[in-house]
């Protein structure tokens, strides 16, 4: 081997070491770790696509099509959010909707797998009635309201849509109703009374059973 080849080999090794010291190619491992962490974070949530619509816009050169997706994301333990994504492709629209839903997370007050009290949610022309149910009842809901309740982790509930059957209106009405729920402790503090004076006996028993489990 000639002296020039040896020097060329040493130069290549030095260049590789310089790149590694500067964090050039070895950064790929860090990027992969970040991607894996983001993927694990997404996998721990429940995602439901309620509806996908195609939207067309008339321009000078013709029509431009895009897609909108209504997505619900929850952890199944009381956290849920709704997002609306728009993109030129369906997967991108779903991804944007899921990201927006995670930004809109809110906590649903529950006792022993059901909501704390009856409530009625309204949004635009959508009206949804929600009532607590006994253990073992299941999620008695149809249409677009069921995915919201399932992603939130509600196990027993009675739900009925009283207004527009439009999926977007039903979802937002369901979310509006869930956001109006309050815990019995909050009601007791607001009225200046004890929890036993405010909450029904059946709710207190269910609450005690849930804490014991």
Swiss-Prot record:
Gene Ontology process terms (BP): translation
Any Pfam family hit: Ribosomal_S5
Gene Ontology terms: cellular component: small ribosomal subunit
Keywords assigned: Ribonucleoprotein, Ribosomal protein, RNA-binding, rRNA-binding
Gene3D superfamilies linked to this entry: 3.30.160.20, 3.30.230.10
Comment on protein domains: The N-terminal domain interacts with the head of the 30S subunit; the C-terminal domain interacts with the body and contacts protein S4. The interaction surface between S4 and S5 is involved in control of translational fidelity.
Oligomer and partners: Part of the 30S ribosomal subunit. Contacts proteins S4 and S8.
Protein name: Small ribosomal subunit protein uS5
Organism of derivation: Corynebacterium urealyticum (strain ATCC 43042 / DSM 7109)
């Amino acid at each position: 081997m000639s002296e020039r080849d040896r020097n060329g080999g040493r130069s290549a090794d030095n260049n590789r070491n310089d790149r590694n010291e500067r964090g050039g190619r070895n950064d790929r491992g860090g990027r992969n770790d970040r991607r894996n962490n983001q993927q694990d974070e997404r996998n721990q949530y429940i995602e439901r696509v309620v509806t996908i619509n195609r939207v067309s816009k008339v321009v000078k050169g013709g029509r431009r099509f895009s897609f909108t997706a209504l997505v619900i994301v929850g952890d199944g333990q009381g956290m849920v959010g709704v997002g609306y994504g728009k993109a030129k492709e369906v997967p991108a629209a779903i991804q944007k909707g899921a990201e927006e839903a995670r930004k809109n997370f809110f906590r649903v007050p529950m006792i022993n797998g059901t909501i704390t009290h009856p409530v009625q949610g309204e949004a635009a022309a959508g009206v949804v009635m929600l009532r607590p149910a006994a253990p073992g009842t299941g999620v008695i809901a149809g249409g677009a309201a069921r995915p919201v309740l399932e992603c939130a982790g509600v196990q027993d509930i009675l739900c009925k849509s009283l207004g527009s059957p439009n999926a977007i209106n039903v979802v937002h009405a369901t979310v509006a109703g869930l956001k109006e729920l309050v815990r019995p402790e909050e009601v007791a503090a607001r009225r200046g009374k004890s929890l036993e004076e405010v909450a029904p006996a059946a709710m207190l028993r269910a609450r005690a059973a849930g804490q014991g489990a």
